[in-house]
């Protein structure tokens, strides 16, 4: 009788273990289904951002090719810019949430965890690539718009240097150079384009600053992802090159007071931040090796 009781107890324990394993498997399957659903949603958002970036590039070209762009074109661009920011913030938050959950499960090494890490890394890299293209398109549009302003000023008989033009853009007041323009039909058209391009650049710079903040956040998000370090380091190096060029231009403009001095301070702060990020990346790269 005693042996029979032990057999029944052992059988019951085995059944309980089997039940626990089934419950764990079911829970894990449900969790991974939810994870892949989030991955797909995030991937679709990144693809949509990529489409919007291509549309924005087309609108940039249209605006640059027309002396006085249609208001609807600018409205369409404004809507696209808003949509890109909205989706980009959504993607960033999703990736950060995924990273948090991965860190919480880091103590448990499993095939599922490796899959989640891999998917997170792929999406992060794709997101950086898309947003880098957007940043490049914005910077290109700004430079070409600035060139159009410079040419229109020359038409009116006012020649300006790059430093003087940057001073005008930072002041937010095109009247610094447009005041006193001869009252002729050609000058009026040129003046209208100058003011329009100036407004475009002011709006664009606000977006570029927001994008810069997002890039800093992304850099923190992917800093421990091995191969992602090379991509971020490359992006930072390109940015540093642009900042170094701007700093050299600022040195030549030291004679200007007020806004020019403010510009130098801003550039120095940006350089320090970027060099700090670059140092962090190099340190992490050495650590990973």
Curated annotation (Swiss-Prot):
Gene Ontology MF: a single term: SNAP receptor activity
Disruption phenotype: Knockout animals show progressive photoreceptor degeneration. At 5 weeks of age, an approximately 60% decrease in thickness of the outer nuclear layer (ONL) and in the number of ONL neuronal somata is observed, indicating that a large number of photoreceptors have died. In some of the remaining rods, rhodopsin is appropriately localized to the outer segments, but a marked amount of rhodopsin mislocalized to the outer plexiform layer. At 8 and 12 weeks of age, increasing cell loss and further ectopic expression of rhodopsin are observed.
Main location: membrane
UniProt topological domain (Extracellular) ranges: 284-289
Single Gene Ontology BP annotation: intracellular protein transport
Stretches assigned to coiled coil: 32-111
Bilayer topology: Single-pass type IV membrane protein
Gene3D superfamilies per UniProt: 1.20.5.110, 1.20.58.70
Localization per record: Membrane
Pfam families noted in UniProt: SNARE, Syntaxin
This protein's record includes keyword Disulfide bond: no
Tissue: Expressed in the retina (at protein level).
Ranges per topology, Cytoplasmic: 1-263
Family the entry assigns: Belongs to the syntaxin family.
Protein name: Syntaxin-3
UniProt organism field: Mus musculus (Mouse)
Gene that produces this protein: Stx3
């Amino acid at each position: 009788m005693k042996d029979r009781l032990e057999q029944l107890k052992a059988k019951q324990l085995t059944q309980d273990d089997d039940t626990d394993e089934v419950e764990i498997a079911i829970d894990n399957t449900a969790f991974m289904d939810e994870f892949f659903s989030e991955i797909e949603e995030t991937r679709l958002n990144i693809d949509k951002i990529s489409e919007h970036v291509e549309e924005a590039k087309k609108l940039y070209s249209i605006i640059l090719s027309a002396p006085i762009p249609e208001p609807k074109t600018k409205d369409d661009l404004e809507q696209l810019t808003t949509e890109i920011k909205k989706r980009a913030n959504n993607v960033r938050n999703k990736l950060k949430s995924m990273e948090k959950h991965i860190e919480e499960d880091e103590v448990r090494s499993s095939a599922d965890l490796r899959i989640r890490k891999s998917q997170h890394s792929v999406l992060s890299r794709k997101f950086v690539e898309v947003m880098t293209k957007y940043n490049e398109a914005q910077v290109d549009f700004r430079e070409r718009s600035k060139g159009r302003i410079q040419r229109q000023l020359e038409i009116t008989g006012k020649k300006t240097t790059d430093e003087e033009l940057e001073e005008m853009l930072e002041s937010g007041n095109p009247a610094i150079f447009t005041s006193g323009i001869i009252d002729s039909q050609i000058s009026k058209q040129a003046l209208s384009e100058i003011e329009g391009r100036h407004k475009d650049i002011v709006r664009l710079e606000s977006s570029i600053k927001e994008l810069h903040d997002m890039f800093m956040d992304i850099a923190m998000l992917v800093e421990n992802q091995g191969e992602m370090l090379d991509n971020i380091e490359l992006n930072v190096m390109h940015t540093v090159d642009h900042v170094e060029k701007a700093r050299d231009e600022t040195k030549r403009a030291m004679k200007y007071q007020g806004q020019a001095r403010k510009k130098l301070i801003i550039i120095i702060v940006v350089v320090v931040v970027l060099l700090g990020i670059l140092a962090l990346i190099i340190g992490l790269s050495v650590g990973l090796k």
